[in-house]
Amino acid sequence: MATRYDAVVIGAGPAGEGAAMKLVKEGRRVAVIDQLGEVGGNCAHVGTIPSKALRQTVYNLMRFRRDPLLSRMADIRSVPLSQVLARAHKVIETQVSTHHRFFERNDVDLYFGQARFEEPNLISVLTPEGITERIGFEHAVIATGSRPYQPADIDFN
């Protein structure tokens, strides 16, 4: 027996979250499916958030070293990379936790695994544990991200 929803959103990144929240605000019962096993999409886990967190940490260290007053307070000439990476991971954890609360607070059901359309209004989700869950729906939103197009005659490097 399939669990029924008004709408199902495939992808728990920024676009999927936005679509889910809009649908919930319209009074729809919504499920979100993501294959990563966590909300936030590539933006939170391998893209924008990690790179910006690393950049900000390095920027702050450089600023600290250049400030005459602050640089006398502590010696930060050598900060272990493990500490810099730990800071980035903390930022990611905070982002994921925040977005998880958005889904919970708005009663959006989360499914983690690979989604597959079985019929026009039925999706199966194969979980990492090997369990198949069936989800019936009226409307579907596919928000699985994109990749940049790279024309053959343009060097991206």
Give a label for each model feature.
Residues 2-5, 14, 22-28, 34-157:
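Glycine-rich flavin
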